[in-house]
Amino acid sequence: MSDYKTIAESKNFIVLDKYNKEWQVAESYQSEGDLEREFIQDLVNQGYESPLGLTTPDALLANVRVQLQALNNAQFSDGEWQRFVETWLDKPSDGIAEKTRKVHDDYVHDFVFDDGHIQNIYLLDKKNIARNKVQVIKQLEQKGSHANRYDVTILVNGLPLVQVELKKRGVAIREAFNQVHRYSKESFNSANSLFKYLQVFVISNGTDSRYFANTTQRNKNSFDFTMNWAKADNTLIKDLKDFTATFFQKDTLLKVLLRYSVFDTSNTLLVMRPYQIAATERILWKVNSAWQAKSWSTLEGGGFIWHTTGSGKTLTSFKAARLATELDFIDKVFFVVDRKDLDYQTMKEYQRFSPDSVNGSDSTAGLKRNLDKDDNKIIVTTIQKLNNLMKSEPDLPIYGKQVVFIFDECHRSQFGEAQKNLKKRFKRFYQFGFTGTPIFPDNALGAETTASVFGRELHSYVITDAIRDEKVLKFKVDYNDVRPQFKAIETELDEKKLSAAENKQALLHPDRIREITQY
């Protein structure tokens, strides 16, 4: 048997800082079948199991039984299994939304066995992600309005959570995207279909590989919402070989599916982009490492995230805050905004992501009441309310507890009195800022910069990255001519002539100002 050496590994991050390509470009022609076989072999080399004979829905369901029995250390009789499938796993009334909700929120079912004992049956182990069994199958055939045969399916505990559609190199990747759409209409969502559990689609033509969420929302269901995987410096990972070695690492894929995705209250599945995951991971890593080193309440125990406007900072900050609340040693997580309207807006957005995960307040007294609650909810507040609380309440129990602060738009409004009070009152805090416009020494009006207040930059995704990824609109620049008689003076090189003439004759001439203002 061949020896395979690790080519991508990180104990902290799934979005890698470094990745070394260790394969040669094939000299010969590669058919779609060759591409598929090579892809599956690469997955097997990475620890995926490749069971034979799983080519029908009945075989798929039988495999789910084997995997769930192993995961839960339980044995179903044939009658019990039939009842479990019909009443919960694959209820006839379940649609794609109900199945997805089971993956995200309702993944534990209290099942009553025939002898009367009750056991929690887990679909997925979210605490110990490595316990989930990952398998790869190919060419499964399923009938709906038409019979379809799917290229490659990734099973987690037997459930089809990822569907991969491949086209040979040179074929437009949109063809794979269109094929996935056709399957969604024709057979994925047919009655009694475990494919309603699908979370993520991956499409590739060998040279370009992308992933996207399985959603029925029409406004989220276009090619524009497909994403490349990337390294931490936002270098795109496109080739299927590289994509397989990074995105399809078992730990990475399971974390994307089970940790870095959100099924919101409007039944829209959001799968995070690489830069959002990278930022979230680095915040959590910083909190952990600062706690272990006891370097809380210092610049070393914090940092800032430079993500451009429109890149989805709200989802990133929510995930960072939500996962921080799950750390055993963290008592409270604050999300701090600088305007009252943003306070309400963020509350609504966070409640959309997860209805029971957040506490808001409409006053300083309300904020104090929320601090007294013994729950792990995120507290959303304005900097003004937080500052008023710190000024009016010099001695609160929260001041001595382990607290994470995440500041939205960490610009100059957070550099003043509130920062001083925070550092004076809170004894064990970790603070992080999100910004689209960081303040550096060369554009600082005062002594403070973003780094001097929050700590070093932990991750960046700037406007040029977003334009390249087509996640924000390009700049539109118009060069407009004003009246020609005023143009000559603007190119005058003689400073004496220019200073004498510019005000009266050209730049402040009423006709010129009128031309510009009326444009």
Question: What positions do the PLM features span?
Answer:
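Conserved RecA-like ASCE ATPase "motif II neighborhood" in helicase/translocase motors
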Residues: I378-N421
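Conserved motor-coupling elements within RecA-like helicase/translocase cores
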Residues: R352, A365-I379, L396-P397
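Short, conserved "post-DEAD/DEAH" coupling segment immediately C-terminal to helicase motif II
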Residues: Y183-K185, S413-Y430
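ATP-dependent helicase/translocase motor core
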Residues: S2-K332, D341, Q345-S357, D374-K377, ...
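Conserved helicase motor
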Residues: V337-K340, G360-R369, I383-N388
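Interdomain helical connector at the RecA1-RecA2 junction of SF1/SF2 helicase-like NTPases
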Residues: A444-Y519
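Conserved nucleotide-binding/hydrolysis micro-motifs of P-loop NTPases
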Residues: K168-V171, T207-R210, K340-L342, Q384-N387, ...
